[in-house]
Structure formats: structure tokens, C-alpha cells
């Protein structure tokens, strides 16, 4: 029963992505070269987090689940940076409002997918410890004093750096 809401949200995100792709194809809409490259970077990060979360769930692997939150934070950072960059392109007239809306839909969907993966990872970790204190766990893992989190976060920042 607990999995149904997450699955439904994930299905809604997938449907949103499919609708966006269909709209772009039907209306012959294309992103700028820069926007396409940025989406490729974020897409790669999202593909990695999906793979990590799926494997952690299937194997009930707490250690693997612990690698997910730093990547989720990098994806959050990517969303903010991509939003800012695309807004500048819109203001400069390099992109249309229509492509801007589609771009924002895609990065929002990517970020929500990463959030679902993070939620799954936290569940795996917390249930392995016999508790379910997600907010406390996330606060402690993201603290500056958590060297493992910070190292992973910095590694992912380098891996998914925008140029």
C-alpha cells in the first residue's frame, strides 16, 4: 500500500515526459544546442539515480541507498542552474516562451523523479534501522559534518558539471 502513491507519482511524471516529447515532435519544436546539452547532463544524472535506487530496492542494499541522497542534491542544484540559464536565454530572445515552458516541465519532472528515488532510499535506510524518521535522517545526512555525504556530493558535482 505504501508503494502505490510513489508509483502513481512516478507514472504521472512519465506521462508528463511523454506528453512533452509528443508536443515537441508534433509541433516540430527544438531546443537550442545549449539547452539540449544541459538536458543531456541532467538526464544522465537522473538515469544514474534511477539505476541506483532500483538496485538498492531490489537488493535491499542500505549502502547503495546511502549513495542516493548526494546525487539527489546535485540534481536539485542542476534544476536551479538550468532554470536560471534558460531564463537568461528567454530574456535574450534566444528561445521562445513555448520552448521555455517545455524545458521547465522537463527539468521539473527530472527533479521529481530524483525526489522519488531519494524517498525510496530513505525508506530502505530507515526501515533497516527499525525506524522511520525521514526528516531527522535527511537533516543529519546533509549536515556539513557528514564527510561521506560531502565527498559523494562533490564527486557528483564534478561528474555532472555544466560547461
Language model regions located:
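Cytosolic, long alpha-helical scaffolding segments
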Residues: 1-163
Amino acid at each position: 500500500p505504501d508503494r502505490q502513491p510513489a508509483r502513481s507519482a512516478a507514472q504521472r511524471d512519465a506521462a508528463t515526459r511523454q506528453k512533452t516529447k509528443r508536443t515537441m515532435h508534433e509541433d516540430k519544436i527544438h531546443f537550442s544546442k545549449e539547452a539540449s546539452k544541459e538536458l543531456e547532463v541532467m538526464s544522465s544524472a537522473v538515469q544514474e539515480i534511477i539505476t541506483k535506487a532500483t538496485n538498492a530496492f531490489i537488493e535491499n542494499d542500505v549502502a547503495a541507498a546511502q549513495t542516493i541522497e548526494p546525487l539527489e542534491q546535485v540534481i536539485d542544484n542542476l534544476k536551479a542552474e538550468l532554470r536560471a540559464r534558460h531564463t537568461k536565454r528567454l530574456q535574450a530572445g534566444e528561445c521562445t516562451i513555448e520552448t521555455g515552458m517545455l524545458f521547465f516541465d522537463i527539468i521539473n519532472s527530472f527533479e521529481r523523479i530524483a525526489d522519488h528515488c531519494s524517498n525510496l532510499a530513505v525508506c530502505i535506510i530507515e526501515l533497516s534501522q527499525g525506524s522511520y524518521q525521514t526528516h531527522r535522517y535527511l537533516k543529519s545526512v546533509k549536515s556539513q559534518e557528514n564527510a561521506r555525504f560531502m565527498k559523494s556530493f562533490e564527486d557528483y558535482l564534478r561528474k555532472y558539471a555544466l560547461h
